[in-house]
UniProtKB/Swiss-Prot annotation:
Pfam families on file: FBPase_2
Protein name as catalogued: Fructose-1,6-bisphosphatase class 3
SUPFAM superfamilies from the UniProt entry: Metallo-dependent phosphatases (SSF56300)
Family: Belongs to the FBPase class 3 family.
EC number: 3.1.3.11
EC class name: hydrolase
Catalytic activity, as annotated: beta-D-fructose 1,6-bisphosphate + H2O = beta-D-fructose 6-phosphate + phosphate
GO biological process: gluconeogenesis
Keywords, in A-Z order: Carbohydrate metabolism, Hydrolase, Manganese
Pathway field: Carbohydrate biosynthesis; gluconeogenesis
Cofactor section: Mn(2+)
Organism: Clostridium novyi (strain NT)
Signal sequence interval, chain numbering: none
Entry GO MF terms: fructose 1,6-bisphosphate 1-phosphatase activity
Length: 665
């Protein structure tokens, strides 16, 4: 609003009640004017950097490193600041100090002959680098990012200018004193963490924090400490959310996947869930069963034969319970249209065969001691008792509940942010590329409205009162989101879990994808998706995860003429031989979009000791002619609204509609 509008008082009078509330914060012309100047200045700052990660799958070491190196942003900043004035090995050491300050400093102490000199050089370099990465923020924002113990000192050093002789001596004196009083390691650690924090302003996690990796709970702890993060739920996240909410079918799936990959760290050590009842049950029921189809898939894990035997039996036990519980859900919800996954009643238990759509297949395992052929989906008394105990463990795990509450508070099915549409799986489509229409509770949904409905149901599953019919339905929908034919998280027509365990013919294992995956390279279809979510397709993108990009086979992560980007992080080691790389991440800064492809990460130990960073290749997707400013972002839109409201308040003061007050001290 401009001041030429002063004579038009209708809008101001209409909003007078709100403006009086605003006047409590800005009680006079002076304070309102100062805030307008401040906000206008912020609008002209460069847009801050966003970092996009996806499909972490519990691989906490790789995730931690990519988070610390910001997909190569810190190395690029070091190159920008120091150019050819530092050798490559010096740049590597400086980068490693920033990533892992405490651990790297311990090694430096053991190898460096003149430690004071090394401290001095490193401090100057870190201060110079921090000055550059903080330059796109207001002093107020930088101040909030500073650690309490060193806040004043770091702020002084960041705003020293070489042209001021007196200040230069003051600056040198601070650095020397830090070293003299043996506080250099603590200061280096503090300023390194400030650089880590400032180099990326917003972190987007596009799904699948959980899965087969050994440290999902460690990743969640890191995310809870992060200054600004959002999460778009993945199918594996939905499964854990359903389990934490009390869905027995989701709990069985979570346990089955963990046992399939012999990953019990997260279950037992991370969340304190007691698996002894499951182990006891499995050893009793499957004592003499080799459970050959349930031997866990281990990657870089050494297990004893006894451990393998026990895990295999637990694996089979929970899988059979899962098939029974899923069958009950399907029977209770004919509207799910999943009768093709009712398979226990298709087994001929005498002949050891199964009938799939009129085709008879031989089973590779015919030992089903807990299945009643006349009522195959009914739990035995012991199975029912077991699943109740396991459910209590999940819903009473304090740490799991805390993590999942965070997942809800920071997460959603999708996010529109700075002209980008972020989601993990897909927007369900028909064969002709139009939005798939699905009926839930008698109401038809498609496109954006469908994802909004699933988002609402996911929250009802966790937050609604236990025992209510609405909660029960929402819990069943969490399982549907995991494997249902029209789930935007699953993105396939059916899940062939039982077939993969019990039928050797791999033709029965195929899982056909939703037509979305055929059309996500089609610019017209992606344009329609962007419009559906209220975005301008000429300057917007879909950021997508879920399906690994098979770079090895020549697949390109850039689709639909650059309108859709696939950034499955490739953290999951099992996919890396298939994809050929360790996935993609995305950076969106004031200059444009940068897509990074990564080689597999070895270990944090090697990163510290041998300075082995992840090798990354960066593609510049879009480069703007003039740098994007805060004014061009979602935050900028909000600031402009605030400025307009403050200008209205100024007019109200000048017209005498609101009386000025003294500024509050």
């Amino acid at each position: 609003m401009t001041f030429c509008d002063e004579n038009n008082l209708d809008l101001i009078k209409k909003d007078l009640r709100y403006l009086k509330l605003l006047a409590n914060q800005y009680p006079n012309i002076s304070s309102a004017s100062t805030e307008i100047v401040n906000l206008e200045a912020i609008l002209n700052l460069p847009k801050s950097t966003e970092h996009f990660l996806s499909d972490i799958h519990g691989e906490y070491e790789s995730f931690t490193h990519v988070l610390k190196n910001a997909s190569g942003v810190i190395k690029r900043k070091i190159d920008d600041v120091f150019g050819n004035s530092l050798r490559d090995n010096e740049k590597l050491t400086l980068a490693t100090v920033i990533y892992y300050p405490e651990q790297k400093l311990e090694l430096i102490k053991q190898s460096e002959k003149d430690l004071s000199d090394w401290y001095k050089i490193t401090l100057y370099r870190l201060i110079e680098l921090c000055r550059v990465v903080s330059s796109k923020y207001t002093r107020s924002k930088v101040r909030k990012a500073l650690p309490h113990d060193f806040a004043y000192i770091i702020e002084e050093l960041l705003h020293e200018h070489d042209g001021t002789i007196n200040k230069h001596e003051y600056y040198n004196g601070i650095v020397s004193t830090i070293i003299d009083i043996d506080r250099a390691p603590e200061f280096i650690t503090a300023i390194s963490k400030v650089i880590q924090r400032l180099v990326v302003d917003r972190l987007h996690i596009i799904g699948d924090i959980y899965d087969r990796g050994p440290g999902a709970e460690i990743i969640m702890e890191e995310l809870m400490k992060h200054h600004s993060v959002d999460i778009q739920w993945g199918n594996h996240d939905i499964l854990w959310m359903g389990a934490a909410a009390g869905s027995e079918a989701c709990i069985c799936n979570v346990l089955r996947i963990s046992l399939r990959y012999a990953n019990l760290n997260t279950i037992e050590d991370g969340y304190g869930i007691n698996l002894l009842p499951l182990a006891t049950f499995a050893m009793d029921v499957y004592e003499n069963d080799p459970c050959n189809s349930f031997i866990p898939k281990t990657i870089n894990k050494e297990l004893t034969q006894n451990e393998l035997n026990l895990i295999s039996k637990m694996h089979k036990a929970i899988a059979i319970i899962q098939f029974k519980l899923q069958g009950q859900i399907i029977k209770n919800h004919p509207e799910f249209k999943m009768d093709d996954q009712l398979l226990l009643d298709k087994i001929n238990y005498e002949k050891g065969t199964i009938d799939l759509d009129g085709h008879i297949y031989k089973l590779n395992d015919t030992f089903f001691p807990t299945v009643d052929p006349k009522d195959p989906y009914k739990l035995t008394e012991n199975e029912d008792d077991l699943i109740k105990k396991l459910t209590r463990s999940f819903v009473n795990s304090e740490k799991l509940q805390r993590h999942i509450r965070f997942m809800y508070s920071k997460g959603s099915m999708y996010l529109v942010y700075n002209s980008n549409l972020l989601y993990h799986g897909c927007v369900p489509l028909n064969e002709d590329g139009t939005f798939k229409e699905i009926t839930i509770d008698g109401v038809r949904y498609s496109g954006k409205s469908l994802l909004d409905k699933f988002d609402s149901l996911a929250r009802e599953a966790f937050f609604f009162k236990n025992g209510s019919s609405a909660k029960r339905f929402a819990l069943d929908m969490m399982w549907y989101l995991w494997c249902g034919p029209n789930s935007p998280e699953f993105g396939k027509l059916r899940m062939t879990t039982l077939e993969r365990y019990f039928i050797d013919d791999k033709g029965t294992h195929i899982e056909y994808r939703n037509p979305y995956y055929k059309y996500r390279s089609n610019e017209k279809v992606v344009t329609n998706i962007l419009k559906e979510f209220g975005l301008d397709p000429d300057c917007s993108h879909v950021i997508n995860g879920h399906i690994p990009v098979k770079t090895k086979a020549g697949e390109n992560p850039i689709k639909a003429n650059g309108k859709l980007l696939v950034i499955d992080g490739g953290f999951c080691r099992a996919y890396q031989p298939e994809t050929g790389i360790a996935g993609y991440t995305l950076i969106y800064n004031s200059y444009g979009l940068l897509l990074s492809s990564h080689e597999p990460f070895s270990s944090i130990r090697k990163a510290i000791e041998e300075e082995k960073d992840i090798l990354s290749s960066t593609i510049i997707l879009e480069q703007v002619v003039s740098r994007k400013r805060v004014a061009d972002t979602d935050i900028g839109k909000e600031l402009k609204k605030q400025i307009a409201e403050l200008k209205m308040l100024l007019i109200a003061y000048r017209k005498g509609l609101i009386k000025e007050q003294d500024s509050k001290s």
